[in-house]
């Protein structure tokens, strides 16, 4: 998204700017609408700027939906605890393969992830440490940044999206 003369304290104009950056690869969708084949769901929120916020001019934040999760088993995990965390049947975890610490298992979970800034990896948990089934219902109140306003949902093509410095509209 071009960042010239824009505020992130409200949603006004942001969804249109997202689409204008990749007009053939992004379209608006309703939050519960299934995306076309080859697309995935993204939800956008803003943190209104306030003098007490870490970023006074506001900030925007995206959550990305994943139908399938690749999960590395940690010490202390059980099939039941992983199923409970992702809010899925335990049988789905059992079908994912041998349950051994350090092993990656792949299963359907239909959860969202997000990134807190450029320097972090994707997170599957909200501000309370819970899995994110619907970002609108998740805890988005992080220290200094409360992404309290839902803006829009989009469906994004799986490949070919331009972001950051790779896009000519981005400064």
Which residues are covered by each model-predicted region?
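N-terminal trafficking/processing presequences and adjacent post-cleavage segments
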Residues: 1-6
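...with weaker cross-activation on analogous glycine-rich loops/strands in unrelated enzymes
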Residues: 7-70, 104-119
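Generic structural motif
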Residues: 48, 76, 158-159
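Primarily a LysM-type cell-wall glycan-binding module
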Residues: 69-89, 100
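Residues in the helix-turn-helix
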Residues: 92
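Residues in the recognition helix of alpha-helical DNA-binding motifs
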Residues: 96
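Active-site or metal-binding loop neighborhoods of secreted/extracellular toxin and effector enzymes
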Residues: 101-171
């Amino acid at each position: 998204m071009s960042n010239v003369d824009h505020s992130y304290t409200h949603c006004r104009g942001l969804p249109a700017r997202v689409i204008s950056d990749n007009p053939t690869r992004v379209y608006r969708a309703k939050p519960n609408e299934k995306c076309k084949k080859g697309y995935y769901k993204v939800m956008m929120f803003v943190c209104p700027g306030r003098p007490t916020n870490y970023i006074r001019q506001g900030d925007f934040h995206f959550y990305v939906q994943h139908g399938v999760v690749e999960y590395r088993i940690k010490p202390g995990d059980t099939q039941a605890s992983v199923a409970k965390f992702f809010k899925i049947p335990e049988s789905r975890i059992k079908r994912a393969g041998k349950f051994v610490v350090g092993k990656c298992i792949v299963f359907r979970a239909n959860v969202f992830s997000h990134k807190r800034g450029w320097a972090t990896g994707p997170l599957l948990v909200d501000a309370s440490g819970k899995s994110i089934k619907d970002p609108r219902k998740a805890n988005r109140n992080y220290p200094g940044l409360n992404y309290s306003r839902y803006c829009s949902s989009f469906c994004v093509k799986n490949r070919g999206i331009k972001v950051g410095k790779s896009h000519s509209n981005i400064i």
